[in-house]
């Protein structure tokens, strides 16, 4: 019998990731920082810490501006506000640059960047580079009162209703809805009922739903991205909701929510299987080759820390029917990421460009994963069901490309995100990705990622 041969690696699948620390963002915050959120199109990064938010320039890796005075306790979570009617929330057309903050004081706050919005948001490209360099924290001094005024944020509106701290918040892709979650076990959905399209119009939001089906703190909320063809077309959907929300909880479950035909927000699926608190979740942002609905990744405490969930496609397909279909959905766990972490996973980021996943947590480890080719035969994958019962497709396998230990020394790492590079060391500014981690040490650290 001939000796077994080693399989030849698939050249299309990355085999190794090398992480190299870049100079940290300046200045150091010297206090626990919770998360750093990149703007979807502009070279800006918002970091929540203490009672404020520091906005960094991705072009200079230094401070651009700060949001202070809106909260009585620490800012736990931050999100960039999409422009009304869609878009990216700043720059062209005179639309404001906006942020929302969630705090331990049980409120959420809406902020706007005052001054030349077009310059601040990069109208035409050159304006933002001048603005972020002007706002760099290099201690250059000599700024005029007028220049200082350009970088001011205004606290426009406070959203009250939660009984305890706001753990997470997220805007729907079009900006119409804002979801907030709290230690009070609830998810609130707010609707933007402002009349204008930006400029000097006042923010006006009203509560449209309070979702109280979780049995524990709701740690995170996330809206399914709508920029993917399969999400826009409603592939795999069982009714006409245009927005899909997922929530993760201390009760060890994830819930999926949609708006029904009567305009009520309802739970359409409960994802169970984690053996501990589900700390958060991430929707797949890269279009799937099989044209299916975006998958959902969840991460938690417990033995199995990171799972991938896939919506089971209805076996009815496009056959017309006069019967009203159930809003109930079936989601299957179709992948479990390899075990790397020794303690709770606090944060995962799923790149919309490459499909690579990065994770971090209380053990201070950073891990990067790639998805390997899925099995060709659905039956071999262990997924049950057929044309009649519906399927979620074949299961997939993931591999670890690389790890870093003690990413922030002895401190826990609270957040990780993929982020476009605009700094002088980038080979392809605005296209090349790096990782950014945020820790208990108050350091916001960028990492160069080399894939081979």
Curated annotation (Swiss-Prot):
Swiss-Prot/TrEMBL GO biological process terms: iron-sulfur cluster assembly
User: What residue spans carry the Pro residues bias annotation?
Assistant: 1-12
Q: Which GO terms describe its cellular component?
A: cytosolic [4Fe-4S] assembly targeting complex
Q: Taxonomically, which superkingdom?
A: Eukaryota
Q: Which PROSITE patterns match?
A: WD_REPEATS_2, WD_REPEATS_REGION
> Which portions of the sequence form the region Disordered?
1-24
- Keywords for this protein: Repeat, WD repeat
Does the keyword field hold Repeat? yes
Ranges of the WD repeats in the UniProt entry: 70-121, 161-200, 213-267, 273-319, 340-379, 411-452
Q: What family is reported?
A: Belongs to the WD repeat CIA1 family.
Q: Which HAMAP family match?
A: ciao1 (MF_03037)
Q: Tell me, what does this protein do in biology?
A: Essential component of the cytosolic iron-sulfur (Fe/S) protein assembly machinery. Required for the maturation of extramitochondrial Fe/S proteins.
Protein name (Swiss-Prot/TrEMBL): Probable cytosolic iron-sulfur protein assembly protein 1
Q: Which organism is it from?
A: Chaetomium globosum (strain ATCC 6205 / CBS 148.51 / DSM 1962 / NBRC 6347 / NRRL 1970) (Soil fungus)
């Amino acid at each position: 019998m001939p000796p077994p041969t080693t399989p030849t690696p698939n050249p299309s699948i990355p085999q190794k990731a090398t992480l190299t620390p870049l100079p940290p963002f300046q200045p150091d915050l010297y206090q626990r920082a919770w998360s750093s959120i990149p703007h979807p199109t502009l070279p800006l990064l918002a970091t929540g810490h203490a009672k404020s938010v520091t906005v960094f320039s991705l072009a200079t890796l230094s401070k651009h501006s700060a949001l202070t005075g809106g909260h009585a306790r620490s800012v736990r979570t931050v999100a960039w506000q999409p422009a009304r009617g869609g878009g990216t929330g700043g720059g062209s057309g005179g639309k404001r640059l906006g942020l929302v903050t969630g705090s331990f004081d049980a409120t959420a706050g809406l902020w706007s960047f005052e001054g030349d919005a077009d310059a601040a948001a990069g109208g035409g490209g050159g304006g933002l580079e001048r603005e972020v360099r002007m706002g760099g924290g290099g201690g250059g001094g000599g700024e005029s009162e007028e220049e200082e005024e350009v970088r001011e944020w205004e606290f426009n509106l406070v959203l009250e209703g939660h009984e305890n701290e706001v753990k997470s918040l997220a805007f729907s892709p079009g900006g119409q809805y804002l979801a907030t979650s709290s230690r009070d076990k609830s998810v609130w959905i707010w609707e933007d009922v402002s009349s204008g399209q930006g400029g000097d119009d006042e923010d006006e939001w009203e509560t449209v739903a309070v979702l109280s089906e979780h049995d524990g703190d709701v740690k995170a909320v996330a809206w399914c991205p709508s920029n993917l063809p399969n999400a826009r077309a409603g592939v795999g959907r069982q009714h006409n909701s245009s927005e899909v929300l997922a929530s993760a909880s201390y009760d060890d479950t994830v819930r999926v929510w949609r708006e029904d035909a009567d305009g009520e927000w309802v739970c359409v699926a409960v994802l169970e299987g984690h053996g501990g608190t589900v700390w958060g979740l991430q929707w797949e942002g890269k279009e799937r080759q099989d044209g299916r609905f975006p998958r959902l990744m969840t991460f938690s405490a417990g033995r199995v820390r990171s799972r991938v969930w896939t919506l089971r496609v209805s076996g009815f397909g496009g056959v017309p029917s006069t019967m009203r279909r159930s809003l109930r959905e079936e989601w299957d766990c179709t992948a479990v990421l390899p075990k790397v972490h020794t303690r709770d996973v606090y944060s995962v980021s799923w790149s919309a460009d490459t499909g690579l996943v990065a994770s971090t947590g209380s053990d201070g480890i950073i891990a990067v994963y790639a998805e390997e080719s899925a099995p060709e035969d659905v039956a071999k994958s262990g997924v049950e069901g057929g044309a009649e019962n519906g399927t979620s497709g074949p299961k997939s396998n993931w591999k670890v490309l690389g790890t870093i230990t003690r990413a922030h020394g002895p401190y826990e790492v609270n957040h990780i995100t993929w982020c476009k590079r605009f700094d002088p060391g980038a080979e392809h500014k605005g296209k090349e990705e790096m990782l950014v981690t945020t820790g208990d040490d108050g350091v916001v650290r960028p990492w160069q990622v080399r894939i081979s």
